[in-house]
Amino acid sequence: MDIVLIQAFKFDGIYDAPQNYERDIYKDDYNIVKMLGFTKYLDIFENKISGLNDERRNLTHIQKERIESEIHNLKVIYHSNAFLYIDVAIPYDQLKHLSSEQLWEKPPHLELASNLFSAATSAITACRASIVSPSYEKISEGFYARQNGVIIKEFSNYNIEQNDISMMHLDDREIDSAIAVFKHIYDKKEFKTITSLFSQSLIPTENARLFSFISAWRSLEVFIAKSQQDIQEISLGRLKDKSDDTPDYKFIKKILDVTDGKYHLLQRFYLLATYYNENNIEEDFNEFQSIQKVRNDYFHGTNIDQKDLPLERTQKLFRKYFIFKLHSGLK
């Protein structure tokens, strides 16, 4: 018997998804990450319900109606959506030494699921169009006992929320790319912190917009910081390719002379931009400055409404440079 954590997230950026769609993003003996259309998602939901029939044999008429109403609501609300499905199973024999308090205070499933979610959402975001909303909405999370593939006991309740954001059709080629990226980044230390932070910015309805913005900003900040070891080499290499009287040469030379390799965040970003995105340095540099100013103003007490925090712009800028990094690593 396994103790299983099952999570489901609605893609905010996909509409009119094929209802029978099913792709494995990742799968091993105990962990599964899938993309599902509505019919496939509903199959899993109904199989879970049928597996619990013995437990629910004594349900009242009202309780049975509530279950039917929940299934009806799923069909009404989510019939055209796609879902990210995460299934993490741990054999009961590996958990039985824990007391109930030890197990449920911090279930070991959660870290495993978080790592899978981080890698999957970062990979998918990197492989979809930049104009598509990268956010997700968690619509369910539950712990179950499963034996021989059948759920026999439920430890938590199903939760459903609704949220609508701009979307696009699903392109299967994007998922082919996302699977390749997932394999490249999953469980690698250099990506773990970055993708973990970024993925937390993708669930604004659960984490609140402020927390999502902080997560997006921190993912960008940490990404830049982790590139520190490359910056000196990047900068010196760029100087060789430029004329002494160009603005870029003078700016980079000034940074190197004044900071002696100890760069401020803004300077680090500029140097990375010269390496990854030389044709649009000024545009990206100004965008980074603008986002950083809003972030600093907010945390120094300026009255800024949370809805005006540049969450999507920060996600977009991170996505852009994350893709540059992936391209350099996947060649």
Locate each region found by the language model.
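Alpha-solenoid helical repeat scaffolds
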Residues: 225-229, 301
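Histidine-centered, metal-coordinating catalytic motifs and their short helical/loop contexts
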Residues: 270-324
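Charged, non-catalytic interaction/linker regions at domain boundaries
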Residues: 1-214, 218, 222, 230-234, ...
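Flexible secondary-structure boundary motifs
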Residues: 232-286, 327
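Charge-rich, solvent-exposed alpha-helical interaction surfaces
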Residues: 70, 178-181, 251-255, 268-275, ...
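Positions within ordered alpha-helical repeat solenoids
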Residues: 222-225, 297
